[in-house]
């Protein structure tokens, strides 16, 4: 992948990262970004997801290298764990309310399965999962729900949702998404917050 995001930087000291570490069963990858370039709509969002994918790959590599140090005291140079072809990514603008929707839990059965006031996506038919579903319905039970989801997003979008530009992206442009295509699902969104001139990229992919 030819990397186009050198004008971008990850906001590694943002307090959101400290908060999300407390949710250790959350499988979403978040990336908070500032950009030296002026906002250019679709083009800026596409740069943001390319930048975020690289940062998430670097995190994954760092984690594996740290594990090697802990296990054997030495490391080997490793390539990034997946490939990306950003030219294949296609995005569509959506309403912030669609991204941040919180469904009603109608009931919970005796084994803990929840039933909602909306249908669930079928990844085998190419349907992408919703943000709430990615947050609190991962392949293995998280124990999270609407309260935790709202709390996380109140920190992620501290000025509210009125000035958010949101794009939902296809997930056929990186093998990061391969696991999720097997069963549970995939998702990728980019959000530009006009109030604080910040991008948030939200990605998820998992299987059992």
Map each language-model feature to its residues:
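Acidic, proline/glycine-rich low-complexity IDRs
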Residues: 142-208
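Extended, low-hydrophobicity segments enriched in charged/polar residues
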Residues: 2-158
């Amino acid at each position: 992948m030819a990397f186009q995001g050198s004008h971008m930087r990850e906001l590694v000291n943002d307090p959101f990262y400290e908060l999300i570490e407390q949710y250790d069963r959350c499988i979403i990858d978040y990336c908070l970004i500032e950009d030296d370039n002026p906002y250019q709509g679709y083009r800026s969002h596409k740069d943001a997801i390319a930048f975020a994918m690289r940062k998430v790959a670097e995190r994954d590599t760092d984690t594996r290298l740290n594990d090697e140090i802990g296990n054997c005291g030495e490391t080997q140079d490793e390539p990034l764990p997946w490939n990306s072809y950003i030219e294949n990514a296609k995005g569509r603008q959506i309403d912030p309310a669609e991204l941040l929707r919180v469904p009603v839990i109608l009931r919970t059965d005796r084994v803990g399965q929840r039933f909602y006031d909306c249908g669930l996506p079928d990844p085998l038919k190419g349907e992408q999962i919703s943000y709430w579903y990615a947050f609190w319905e991962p392949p293995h039970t998280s124990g999270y729900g609407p309260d935790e989801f709202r709390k996380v997003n109140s920190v992620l979008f501290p000025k509210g949702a009125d000035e958010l530009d949101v794009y939902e992206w296809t997930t056929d442009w990186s093998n990061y998404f391969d696991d999720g295509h097997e069963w549970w699902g995939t998702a990728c969104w980019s959000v530009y917050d006009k109030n604080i001139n910040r991008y948030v990229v939200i990605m998820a992919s998992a299987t059992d």
